[in-house]
Swiss-Prot record:
It comes from the Bacteria. Binds 1 Mg(2+) ion per monomer. The gene is selD. GO terms for biological process: selenocysteine biosynthetic process. ATP binds at residues 19, 47-49, 67, 90, 138-140. Its EC number is 2.7.9.3. It comes from Pseudomonas syringae pv. tomato (strain ATCC BAA-871 / DC3000). Synthesizes selenophosphate from selenide and ATP. The record marks 19 as: Important for catalytic activity. This is Selenide, water dikinase. Homodimer. One of its GO terms (molecular function) is ATP binding. Mg(2+) binds at residues 50, 90, 226.
């Protein structure tokens, strides 16, 4: 009998941990030319937001994003599901609604059979179906490692659009998914994942961030982004720096997957964690190693990081509960201090 194919053995990176580090990305973008200042471009790359938004008229904008990566799990169908869920998330993070997607596929055709790639596409299509959008086409290339993702188009009302740099002092921070995706998937790749933890990370990575569309319609939601490859601290630095504020994070209140402390102690910390910290660690007040290993953990298809005004909290929590989310605050935003983020 043939051994089952383990997709993670065919790639050097995994999921959003494949991202080029913020520090290196700065070097790449610094010499790439200035962005065209089109007044219809409501959101571009200046704030490192989740997606671009271009005006259709005075009230509506088209939301455009793309995301792709190498396998973070061995099962091809699940890889397709995770990659698609992660890509569509950027539309929800802007407060928008997805309209359609096209696939991006890189495949080592001389190494892995096309039937495996078909399962990846099937997984991606299943998620598009769940999101209520067509997978309308795509593009494929022969590549040395498997790569899959989507380019997604959505729409948003200008009054409901949520950016990552518009929070105000006094806002309360919420996170809709637990941290630890990178830690548990690293443990799985090293064959150290305990039986009781099997499937935990996969199930969270396959959970669509559809609540973002509802949160976008709440006036009390001042800013929103999704937590992906740069870890919670990386995306929180972007949110705080962009608004000229400091985020004060309550480490004990941050949701985390069961067993993360065990796996950190076992050395199951992905390489992206340290790359993340090296990129933005100077913007963060002193951390313990344990705090760094969790808070800089690269998330794939992570949750929404939401900044909510105090007067909008009750409505926000009511909507979250209606959507099946039991959320607790993880920190606050305050006037700028020495660092962009403080952890206590």
């Amino acid at each position: 009998m043939n051994e089952p194919i383990r997709l993670t053995q065919y790639s050097h990176g995994a999921g959003c941990g494949c991202k080029i580090s913020p520090k290196v990305l700065d070097v790449i973008l610094a010499g790439s030319g200035a962005q065209n200042l089109d007044p219809k471009l409501w959101v571009g790359n200046t704030s490192r937001d989740d997606a671009a938004v271009y005006a259709l008229d005075d009230e509506r904008g088209v939301v455009s994003t793309t995301d792709f990566f190498m396998p973070i799990v061995d099962d091809p169908f699940d890889f397709g599901r995770i990659a698609a869920t992660n890509a569509i998330s950027d539309i929800y993070a802007m407060g928008g609604d997805p309209l359609m997607a096209i696939a991006i596929l890189g495949w080592p055709v001389n190494v892995l059979p096309p039937e495996v790639a078909r399962e990846v596409i099937r997984g991606g299509r299943a998620v598009c179906d769940a999101a209520g959008i067509p997978l309308a086409g795509g593009h494929s290339i022969d590549a040395p490692e498997p790569i899959f993702g989507l380019a997604v188009t959505g729409v948003v009302q200008k009054k409901h659009m949520k950016r990552n740099d518009t929070a105000q002092a006094g806002c309360v921070l919420y996170l809709t998914k637990p941290l630890g995706i990178g830690i548990l998937t690293t443990a799985e790749k090293k064959a150290r994942l305990r039986e009781e933890d099997m499937g935990l990370a996969r199930d969270w990575m396959c959970t669509l961030n559809t609540p973002g569309s509802r949160f976008g319609k709440l006036a009390g939601v001042a800013a929103m982004t999704d937590v992906t490859g740069f870890g919670l601290l990386g995306h929180l630095v972007e949110m705080a720096d962009g608004a000229g504020l400091t985020a004060r994070l309550d480490y004990a209140a941050v949701p985390r997957l069961p067993g993360v402390e065990h796996y950190i102690a076992e050395g199951c910390v992905p390489g992206g964690t340290l790359r993340n910290f090296e990129s933005y660690g100077d913007k963060i007040a002193a951390l313990s190693d344990a705090q760094r290993d969790l808070l800089c953990d690269p998330q794939t298809s992570g949750g929404l990081l939401v900044a909510v005004s105090p007067e909008g909290e009750a409505e926000f929590l009511a909507v979250a509960a209606e959507l099946g989310l039991q959320l607790n605050p993880i920190g606050t935003l305050l006037e700028r201090q020495t660092h962009a983020v403080e952890v206590f």
